[in-house]
Amino acid sequence: MELLGQKVKEDGVVIDEKILKVDGFLNHQIDAKLMNEVGRTFYEQFKDKGITKILTIEASGIAPAIMAALHFDVPCLFAKKAKPSTLTDGYYETSIHSFTKNKTSTVIVSKEFLSEEDTVLIIDDFLANGDASLGLYDIAQQANAKTAGIGIVVEKSFQNGHQRLEEAGLTVSSLCKVASLEGNKVTLVVEE
């Protein structure tokens, strides 16, 4: 997705050779028009897969996920990082390690909102080592829901997340692939 790649190159801030900050349009302040295009692109890629729910994790995955849900005309369901007092019935849970925050969180999804009747598209803002997407896939499997694929806004292709997801048998669609952050510069993967 050319517009997204341009935004990543122009507005992304390289913190170090493994961390890219995109707070100006994705992770803190959200460019709604860009996220609408992200959602539309995921819809075009997965529209024939029978998607019944978009599944993501709070917080940064919500913006692209809700825009995808809007285009699919299905609910957006996000895994919570803390169990609210209002969640009194059953839930699915898994542990997810955040590469950026270097922190492991237990995330939960209410059994009320995810079941074997669902076909989910998992959406996440970043793909580094794949732990968040694999954790969401684990939750979908616990619910006996079908996973149609994984939609990633920005993939750090120099890390092993994409490979791990494919090894799990998942279809992965990354809209912007970063080849390198070396030399304090964003270099994108050139698609042929």
Curated annotation (Swiss-Prot):
Pathway listed: Purine metabolism; XMP biosynthesis via salvage pathway; XMP from xanthine: step 1/1
EC number: 2.4.2.22
Chief place where the protein resides: cytoplasm
Subunit-structure text: Homodimer.
Family membership noted in the UniProt record: Belongs to the purine/pyrimidine phosphoribosyltransferase family. Xpt subfamily.
Taxonomic source organism: Staphylococcus aureus (strain JH9)
Chain positions recorded as 5-phospho-alpha-D-ribose 1-diphosphate binding sites: 128-132
GO biological process, one term: purine ribonucleoside salvage
Protein name: Xanthine phosphoribosyltransferase
Residue positions binding xanthine: 20, 27, 156
PANTHER family the UniProt entry points to: HYPOXANTHINE/GUANINE PHOSPHORIBOSYLTRANSFERASE, XANTHINE PHOSPHORIBOSYLTRANSFERASE
Subcellular location: Cytoplasm
Main function: Converts the preformed base xanthine, a product of nucleic acid breakdown, to xanthosine 5'-monophosphate (XMP), so it can be reused for RNA or DNA synthesis.
One CC-aspect GO term: cytoplasm
NCBIfam families hit by this protein: PRK09219.1, XPRTase
Catalytic activity: XMP + diphosphate = xanthine + 5-phospho-alpha-D-ribose 1-diphosphate
Domain of life: Bacteria
Keyword line: Cytoplasm, Glycosyltransferase, Purine salvage, Transferase
